[in-house]
Amino acid sequence: MPTIQQLIRSERQELKKKTKSPALKSCPQRRGVCTRVYTTTPKKPNSALRKVARVRLTSGFEVTAYIPGIGHNLQEHSVVMIRGGRVKDLPGVRYHIIRGTLDTAGVKDRKQGRSKYGAKRPKPGAASTASTGKKR
């Protein structure tokens, strides 16, 4: 606890909030080029092959970003857009690749939550019982 004299001499320091996505540099999204596309395994209770990419951003950072959805068309030198948002069971993965922008294709045959995966709205005639797998 400082004395009043110490507070007069120099005021209290403001606590600086540390950002969770420093590579974005206060921007909502950033463009980057994939330097490596690979799969990795999640932390202890979970088991899978998660698709991730190493991305060199326009801000100069090189980060690991998660590729959401089923299937993707990314390879080395693909231009991608990333947003913030970590993947809880992948240590060091703090960013998501945005599907349906630049070189990243949207998820095929996606019916629900399409906006999150860059999927276009299906044609009204194309939605038959055979494609959805549901009985009427």
Curated annotation (Swiss-Prot):
Per its UniProt record, what CDD domains does this chain match? Ribosomal_S12
Modified positions (3-methylthioaspartic acid) in chain numbering:
89
- What keywords sit in the KW lines? Methylation, Ribonucleoprotein, Ribosomal protein, RNA-binding, rRNA-binding, tRNA-binding
- InterPro entries in UniProt: NA-bd_OB-fold (IPR012340), Ribosomal_uS12 (IPR006032), Ribosomal_uS12_bac (IPR005679)
Write down the superkingdom of origin.
Bacteria
* Quaternary structure and partners: Part of the 30S ribosomal subunit. Contacts proteins S8 and S17. May interact with IF1 in the 30S initiation complex.
Biological role: With S4 and S5 plays an important role in translational accuracy. Interacts with and stabilizes bases of the 16S rRNA that are involved in tRNA selection in the A site and with the mRNA backbone. Located at the interface of the 30S and 50S subunits, it traverses the body of the 30S subunit contacting proteins on the other side and probably holding the rRNA structure together. The combined cluster of proteins S8, S12 and S17 appears to hold together the shoulder and platform of the 30S subunit.
What is this protein called in UniProt? Small ribosomal subunit protein uS12
